[in-house]
């Protein structure tokens, strides 16, 4: 009988991006004080051995400031992760475009809550296609 080689896989680590306070919500969920569906599967990931690096959420009135902050946090995160897992693309649009252009190599997984529709103009449609190319 041939011996099977056992390979030890590194546990998967994701960067969990959410537009609300995730760490606090997750701790409240553990104490049955917060609904789990708002955590978009985070409690189940841990059960399957998937480690999470939590995004440090901050609120901004300006979407541009949110994008700059979130992009900086994601690109300069000191903790190692293999996948960017987001509950929304709001705030991480620059990272998605970097992925579409091949400048950000980690896969991006997003819960997209609305239908993808064709844009009205040619230029908008091309930008939209490029944007969605950045989402795995």
Predicted feature residues:
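N-terminal subdomain of nucleotide-sugar transferases
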Residues: 1-58, 79-81
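Short, well-ordered alpha-helical microsegments
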Residues: 91-96
């Amino acid at each position: 009988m041939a011996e099977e080689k056992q390979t030890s896989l590194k546990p998967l680590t994701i960067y969990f991006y959410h537009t609300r306070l995730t760490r606090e919500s997750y701790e409240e969920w553990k104490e049955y004080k917060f609904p789990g569906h708002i955590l978009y599967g985070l409690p189940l990931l841990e059960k399957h051995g998937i480690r999470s690096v939590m995004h440090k959420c901050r609120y901004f009135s300006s979407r541009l400031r949110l994008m700059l902050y979130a992009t900086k946090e994601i690109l300069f995160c000191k903790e190692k992760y293999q996948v960017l897992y987001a509950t929304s693309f709001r705030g991480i649009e620059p990272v998605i475009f970097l992925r579409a252009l091949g400048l950000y190599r980690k896969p991006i997984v997003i819960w997209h809550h609305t239908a993808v529709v064709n844009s009205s103009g040619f230029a908008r449609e091309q930008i939209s296609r490029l944007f969605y190319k950045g989402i795995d």
